[in-house]
Amino acid sequence: VVGGDECNINDHRSLVRIF
């Protein structure tokens, strides 16, 4: 996803943050 490193740490949380 857009996060990159952050996505690796929290996939589900990153999605919520992006949207």
Swiss-Prot record:
GO biological process, alphabetically ordered: proteolysis
Coiled-coil ranges (or none): none
Record-level Gene Ontology MF annotations: serine-type peptidase activity; toxin activity
Location of the protein in the cell: Secreted
Keywords: Blood coagulation cascade activating toxin, Disulfide bond, Glycoprotein, Hemostasis impairing toxin, Hydrolase, Protease, Secreted, Serine protease, Toxin
Modification comment: Glycosylated.
Domain Peptidase S1: 1-19
Domain of life: Eukaryota
Job of this protein: Thrombin-like snake venom serine protease. Releases only fibrinopeptides A after 2 hours incubation. Clots fibrinogen with different clotting time depending on the species: cat > human > dog > goat >> rabbit.
Assembly behavior: Monomer.
Family note: Belongs to the peptidase S1 family. Snake venom subfamily.
UniProt name for this protein: Thrombin-like enzyme purpurase
The organism of origin for this protein: Trimeresurus purpureomaculatus
Lineage, uppermost ranks: Eukaryota, Metazoa, Chordata, Craniata, Vertebrata
